[in-house]
C-alpha cells in the first residue's frame, strides 16, 4: 500500500465520518452485491451452437474488433482476464447457445451435462452462474415468433427449450450453492400494423404457464421474465410488452427483469424499481446503456447507472434485486468493455453506499427540499475515489486506469494470435 493511498484513505474516512458514513461498513456492504457479468460480450452473442450463423431477434452487435473468442476455452480465458481487473464478488450469466458438446444438440434437448465445464470453471473461480434460454438465431425463430408462435409444434419446441433451460439453471444452483436466475426474453413481434394483438399474448401466457409448471427448488432456481418496447423487425408490436410481463410476474410471483434499454428513451428503469417491488418478489436488472434505441452500449458511470444503484441501496433491496449487465460492443476490445462496464456498476453501488441517506430522508420528510438538493450535490464532491481505490487494493485489482495496461498486454500476447 502506498503512502499516498493511505493518506487519501484516511482523509476520505474523516470526510465521510463527518456526514455520518462509516466507510468500512460501506465496503462490507459492497461485498454483499455481486454483479452478474454477461458472457456474450466476449463473442458478440455468437455462442457455440452455430458460431458462424447470423444474430437474429432484432438485436445487433456492431463492429469487428479483432480477438473475438471462438470457443469456450477462449471465452473462459478472456473472462478470467477481465475478472482479475474487477474487484469484489461476481457472477456469470450464460445463454443456452454457450453449451459444449461434441455432437449437435437440439435446443429442446439441452441438458446439465452440456454445461458441466462451465460449472466446474465456476467452482474453481468461486462464481455463481445465471442462465437464459436462447429464443433467437435459430431456424424456428426466423419468422419472428417463438413462445407465441401460431404453429403448435414450433411453439412446443420453444416451450420445451425453456423447460430444459430451467433444469440447467436448477443444476447450476444446486452445484454452486447459490440460486441461478433464469431470464426468459423472446423476440416475438411484428414489423408493421398488427390486427390481432390479443391472440399471440394469449398463446404466450399459456406457453409460459407450461414452461414454469415444473416445481423447482427456489434455493437453486429463480424464474424471471423480460419485456421490451421493440426490436429491429418488430417495430410495431411486441408480444411480451411491459404490461404483459408486469402482469405475469405479479400474478405468477416470478421475478421481473427490467432492462435499461427496453423502454421508451424517455423512460428509466431506476424509477420502476420501487413500483415493481410492491408487487413482485424479486427483480432482475439488466444494466445497459441505450443510445437512442436498445443499442446495448457499454455501461457508463452516468446518472441513470447511479440512480439504479441508489434505488437498490436506499431501499435495502440487496436480497431482492439481482444485478446483471447486458451490453455488447464489438467495436472495442471486448475484455476492456467488460472491465469498464462492470467497474462502473460497482462504482455506482459504492457511491450509493456512501450516501447519507438517513439524513436526506429526514430533510425530505420535513419538506426541506433546499437542503436535500444541496446535500445531494455536495456529496458528489466527497472523496469516494479514495474509498474505491482502497477497495480495489484489498481485492488485489488495479485501482485506476492501469488495468488497461494488463488488457493491452493480453491483447498483444493472446488476442492478436486469433484468426
From Swiss-Prot:
Its EC number is 5.3.1.14. Catalyzes the interconversion of L-rhamnose and L-rhamnulose. One of its GO terms (molecular function) is L-rhamnose isomerase activity. It holds the Pfam family RhaA. Its main location: cytoplasm. GO terms for biological process: L-lyxose metabolic process; rhamnose catabolic process. It catalyses: L-rhamnopyranose = L-rhamnulose. Binds 1 Mn(2+) ion per subunit. Mn(2+) binds at residues 262, 294, 296. The keyword Cytoplasm applies. Pathway: Carbohydrate degradation; L-rhamnose degradation; glycerone phosphate from L-rhamnose: step 1/3. It comes from Shigella sonnei (strain Ss046). Belongs to the rhamnose isomerase family. Keywords: Cytoplasm, Isomerase, Manganese, Metal-binding, Rhamnose metabolism. GO terms for cellular component: cytoplasm. It is found in: Cytoplasm. This is L-rhamnose isomerase. The gene is rhaA. InterPro entries: L-rhamnose_isomerase (IPR050337), Rhamnose_isomerase (IPR009308), Xyl_isomerase-like_sf (IPR036237). Its cofactor is Mn(2+). Homotetramer. The keyword Protein biosynthesis does not apply. HAMAP family: RhaA (MF_00541).
Amino acid at each position: 500500500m502506498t503512502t499516498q493511498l493511505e493518506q487519501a484513505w484516511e482523509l476520505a474516512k474523516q470526510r465521510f465520518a463527518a456526514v455520518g458514513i462509516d466507510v468500512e461498513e460501506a465496503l462490507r456492504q459492497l461485498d454483499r452485491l455481486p454483479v452478474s457479468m454477461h458472457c456474450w460480450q466476449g463473442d458478440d452473442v455468437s455462442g457455440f451452437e452455430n458460431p458462424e450463423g447470423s444474430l437474429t431477434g432484432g438485436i445487433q452487435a456492431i463492429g469487428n474488433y479483432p480477438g473475438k473468442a471462438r470457443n469456450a476455452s477462449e471465452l473462459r480465458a478472456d473472462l478470467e482476464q477481465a475478472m482479475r481487473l474487477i474487484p469484489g464478488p461476481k457472477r456469470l450469466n450464460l445463454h443456452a447457445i454457450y453449451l459444449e458438446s461434441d455432437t449437435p444438440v437440439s435446443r429442446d434437448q439441452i441438458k446439465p451435462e452440456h454445461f458441466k465445464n462451465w460449472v466446474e470453471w465456476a467452482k474453481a473461480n468461486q462464481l455463481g452462474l445465471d442462465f437464459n434460454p436462447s429464443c433467437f438465431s435459430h431456424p424456428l425463430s426466423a419468422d419472428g415468433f417463438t413462445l407465441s408462435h401460431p404453429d403448435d409444434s414450433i411453439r412446443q419446441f420453444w416451450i420445451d427449450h425453456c423447460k430444459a433451460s430451467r433444469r440447467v439453471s436448477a443444476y447450476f444452483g444446486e452445484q454452486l450453492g447459490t440460486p441461478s436466475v433464469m431470464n426468459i426474453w423472446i423476440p416475438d413481434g411484428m414489423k408493421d400494423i398488427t390486427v390481432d394483438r390479443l391472440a399471440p399474448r394469449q398463446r404466450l401466457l399459456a406457453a409460459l404457464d407450461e414452461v414454469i409448471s415444473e416445481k423447482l427448488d427456489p434455493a437453486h432456481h429463480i424464474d424471471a421474465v423480460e419485456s421490451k418496447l421493440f426490436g429491429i423487425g418488430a417495430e410495431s408490436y411486441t408480444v411480451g410488452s411491459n404490461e404483459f410481463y408486469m402482469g405475469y410476474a405479479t400474478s405468477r410471483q416470478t421475478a421481473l427483469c427490467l432492462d435499461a434499454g427496453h423502454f421508451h428513451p424517455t423512460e428509466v428503469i431506476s424509477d420502476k424499481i420501487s413500483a415493481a417491488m410492491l408487487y413482485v418478489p424479486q427483480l432482475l436488472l439488466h444494466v445497459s446503456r441505450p443510445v437512442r434505441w436498445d443499442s446495448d452500449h457499454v455501461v457508463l458511470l452516468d446518472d441513470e447507472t447511479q440512480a439504479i444503484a441508489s434505488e437498490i441501496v436506499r431501499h435495502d433491496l440487496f436480497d431482492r434485486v439481482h444485478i446483471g449487465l447486458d451490453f455488447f460492443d464489438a467495436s472495442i476490445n471486448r475484455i476492456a468493455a467488460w472491465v469498464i462496464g462492470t467497474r462502473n456498476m460497482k462504482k455506482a453501488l459504492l457511491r450509493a453506499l456512501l450516501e447519507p441517506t438517513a439524513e436526506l430522508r429526514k430533510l425530505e420528510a420535513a419538506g426541506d427540499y433546499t437542503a436535500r438538493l444541496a446535500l445531494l450535490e455536495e456529496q458528489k464532491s466527497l472523496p469516494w475515489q479514495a474509498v474505491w481505490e482502497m477497495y480495489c487494493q484489498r481485492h488485489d485489482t488495479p485501482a485506476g486506469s492501469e488495468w488497461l495496461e494488463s488488457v493491452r498486454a493480453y491483447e498483444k500476447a493472446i488476442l492478436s494470435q486469433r484468426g
